[in-house]
Amino acid sequence: MSKSILPKSPQLLEKKLGYVFQNQQLLLEALTHKSCKKQYNNERLEFLGDAVLDLLVGEYLFKKFPLAKEGELSKLRACIVNEKGFMKLAQSLDLGAYLYISQSEENNNGRQKASILSNAFEALIGAIYLESSLTYVQSIIYDLLEYNYIKIDLDSLFMDYKTALQEITQAFYGEIPTYTLISESGPDHKKSFEIALSVQGKEYARASGNSKKEAQQKSAQIAYKKLYSKMNKTHHKGEK
């Protein structure tokens, strides 16, 4: 049985955020998971934070990509405003270390669970908004997005590299890529899969992910960039 772990001091989190709560109870509420069975938890603040994040991420993308169409902006936002995207932002704050969770969740690696981290991040943003202002929350969100999505662009966030790669290999080699599972490791709640991608028996890429689908997409992205570059060089040679 795992030992109970005491959360880090909330004041350390405030220092990271650059924001000090006037109402410390509000901060504790944002950091308390429902599994604790206390009189308060972060579900209501999560509801509020979800709406705030949807607005501010949308505004951030609207300003960052002035030429992007509505459909492109919607896809970009959908790639950030989701459980995985919020987990990434939560991890950049080491938010899991500050959470109050039950012993059962502690035993099940709850501090690293995507759902718990994502919900807590939404709750934290909701709490800051409730106590301060939308403008103040905006500065925090913008900083987090700039830090975590340095190379954010219209292609890298939502391009389906598997489909794009398949189009190239069919045109060049007359066949689709082969994805082979090389290894599978880790406990059930935190699996890691390594996938090798080959075309006509030649390996072009290997990548790992928390799911086979993620590992396939990562390996497809690597192979796509290699073959796309090769395709362009061949095309330019043909023009000479």
Swiss-Prot record:
The keyword Metal-binding applies. SUPFAM superfamilies: dsRNA-binding domain-like, RNase III domain-like. Mg(2+) binds at residues 46, 119, 122. Its EC number is 3.1.26.3. GO terms for biological process: mRNA processing; regulation of gene expression; rRNA processing; tRNA processing. It catalyses: Endonucleolytic cleavage to 5'-phosphomonoester. InterPro entries: dsRBD_dom (IPR014720), RNase_III (IPR011907), RNase_III_dom (IPR000999), RNase_III_sf (IPR036389). Residues 10-133 form the RNase III domain. The keyword Hydrolase applies. Homodimer. This is Ribonuclease 3. The gene is rnc.
